[in-house]
Amino acid sequence: LARETSVVRLGALVTGNTYRNPAVLAKTVTTLDIVSGGRAQLGIGAGWFELEHDAFGVEFGTFTDRFEKLEEALQIILPMLRDERPSLDGKHYQVKDAINHPAPISRIPVMIGGSGEKKTLRLVAQYADESNLTCGLDEVPRKLDALAAHCQRLGRDRSEITVSLQTRACVARKQFSRLSARRC
């Protein structure tokens, strides 16, 4: 895909942090950036699909564990994507002067997926370029208010963060009743 396109940004919408070592993930995304001529992006989240974790033999952990891991991972990944050599002696991850050479061609944007107002949106305000919300349209204003509050508390300009919404669409040849459409 990187070879066949020249404009499209490339990356997973949101990968569960729990599946990969964060330093290796940073190097993987950097490789994608290099082979695509600077078009990589990183979408990441705490991980949510317990059945998939079980099927892959990956520890799912508690809600708290997954968010602790995500924050530690961001403290490793972001500096590596910015051509720095981070060290971290965390509860879940340890790196020492983690190397990421060759460096990315571009400044790789980082998107955090999820809609948790206390943890996820704080991490977005602190670390991310984009927030990919996973909520109903009626919840978006409240989520944006929560994100703005985190940004204000952290001294970050909310307008620096792009917001996208992951939602469902039902495409069909015939009209459905509202109830049928909800089942899509």
Ranges and model annotations:
Residues 1-184:
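Active-site-adjacent structural elements that line small-molecule/cofactor binding pockets in enzymes
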